[in-house]
Amino acid sequence: ALRAAERPIQPPRESNAMDSTTGRRLIQSDVKFEIDISEHETNKGGMVISGGPVLDSILEDLEDELLSSDMGHEASSELIDSLRAHLIGSRVGRGAPLDEVVERALKGAILSLLRSGYWDFDKTIRDLVSSDSPVVIMMVGVNGTGKTTTSAKIAKRLDDQGFDVVLAAADTFRAGAIDQLAAHADRLGVRCIKSQRGGDSAAVARDAIESARAKGDEVVIIDTSGRMQNKANLMEELQKVHRVTKPHLVIFVADALAGNDAVNQAIEFQRRLSFDGAALCKLDTDARGGAALSISHATGRPIVLIGTGQGYDDLEPFNPNWLVDQLIS
């Protein structure tokens, strides 16, 4: 654990601070996203971009690339339409290749969307721990997305940073889920609070928080039951866990391979529960990550973490520049 003297003193509220869905402070990332296309722009002379078959062909090729990267049709169409409207009438140097100008503008537009509301996971946790320990992280999502494994990865990441972490096995609908999280906890050397199958999920989560507070642990990660977003009774049970625990952060876990299904899930979870950021899993597969852009577009919430493998260390802060390179090769 971080001793009190080692914890950062809470700084005055910064201009790059935001609030979570439960009113806690999120620290925006200082990653720079802007892509400079000024080398092609000019105030006089040059060439004015006009609509027509050449521009249409370039934009169609780029839209096909976005769609093949698992980006949803609605998000890609809106992005391309906005780009077309922005480009027409712009003045560029006569020697500027139009396809290069358009591609750079598209990358800038994508980065602009991804940086909207983007916050730094590690900095936010450190800031929250310094002022309101134990910090409670609630993990939500449907079955099969990698939620339990991601919970364990986050526990490992924070344990490596010196925090005492408690895992809460609040997925009480499946005995296998309880055993799985407990096994992760044993391997990681962290505590796991659990009950028998069929227990009260909210009670397990509450017990974990009270135990952490009593023992001076700094972070509680609640692994909730996988909920299909169209099952009202299950979503209501999840809302109960949220009401009882009042988490500092809610992380929605999405499967990069799920494509438009992941987007629909995110929309419904955002409507019923409201999450602060998403963790996109299974990016070690042949998924190119377009679902990340669609989720951000549809919910207004950022991707903050990505899973890149099955190992505990295969969890990284989301880098929007990396995604742009995946989408537009």
Where are these regions (language model features)?
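P-loop/Walker A NTP-binding module and the surrounding RecA-like catalytic core of P-loop NTPases
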Residues: 74, 107-111, 117, 121-329
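Non-catalytic terminal/linker segments enriched in charged/polar, low-complexity residues
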Residues: 1-125, 132-133
